[in-house]
């Protein structure tokens, strides 16, 4: 079982991405195809020890950067690392792929070369949101579809339930619709219609949830569905708030020698909190509903997040997540 890793598309060059992929090989027994400029990748690989039978170096001469138009770039730059990684999945050389590059380009490449699972209307991005305790909450759509119809949201609920069961090991995930109030009649025309559709599905639907519920502040929920416009704003706001809290805490500690002494005593606790809230722990966000495993990472992905990403892609393939999605979408006739 081979995983394609786009090593050229991150913000800081290929070395950290390659390091994470090699760690996945050494520590998790993964098999990876590193997709990028062959000579440069080969030189970096000389810095590491690993089982050479588990690592392949696939040449790709081009790179799609963050400023390129996704729909144009994936057609014009067919020898780019993200397109070549997608092609490895399309031709069944690899069971899945990971790219920390241009999100739009990764989505466009997956849709163009992998296509959708039969019956899936629109593939959503499923992003894990860290929680105080236990596994993360799953937010979808986190940015793939800015405008959604009610049946899209109903399908998101089904796909999110499957992901939460198979990857986070939640036996009966609680599913909610993100809204401006928890009352059944709150929401807009799309969410109200989606509410009625999801209510009829054989899932554990808890109704509308508010923004505070995403962080354990109210209603208990495991999967939250919304359109990609709202979802992406929520995701970016969450990332920014998490960084801001730690920055404020750091600056406050600097103001007092007593606080600095206390911080030394609490260093292990702060480390544990930061680890729990660190998106690197989850590898990235899965593009659900495409006919192949496609995990999208942050542009600033470090070695740890890449290693975790390879693990998530492997688990999705082993647990046949796409087969489950295809079966349930057909069964529920959404």
From Swiss-Prot:
It is an enzyme of class 2 (transferase). SUPFAM superfamilies: Isocitrate/Isopropylmalate dehydrogenase-like. GO terms for biological process: fatty acid biosynthetic process; phospholipid biosynthetic process. Keywords: Cytoplasm, Lipid biosynthesis, Lipid metabolism, Phospholipid biosynthesis, Phospholipid metabolism, Transferase. Pathway: Lipid metabolism; phospholipid metabolism. It is found in: Cytoplasm. The keyword Lipid metabolism applies. GO terms for cellular component: cytoplasm. InterPro entries: FA_synthesis, Phospholipid_synth_PlsX-like. GO terms for molecular function: phosphate:acyl-[acyl carrier protein] acyltransferase activity. Its EC number is 2.3.1.274. The keyword 4Fe-4S does not apply. It catalyses: a fatty acyl-[ACP] + phosphate = an acyl phosphate + holo-[ACP]. Pfam families: FA_synthesis. Belongs to the PlsX family. Homodimer. Probably interacts with PlsY. NCBIfam families: plsX. Catalyzes the reversible formation of acyl-phosphate (acyl-PO(4)) from acyl-[acyl-carrier-protein] (acyl-ACP). This enzyme utilizes acyl-ACP as fatty acyl donor, but not acyl-CoA. This is Phosphate acyltransferase. The lineage of its organism: Bacteria, Pseudomonadati, Spirochaetota, Spirochaetia, Leptospirales. The gene is plsX.
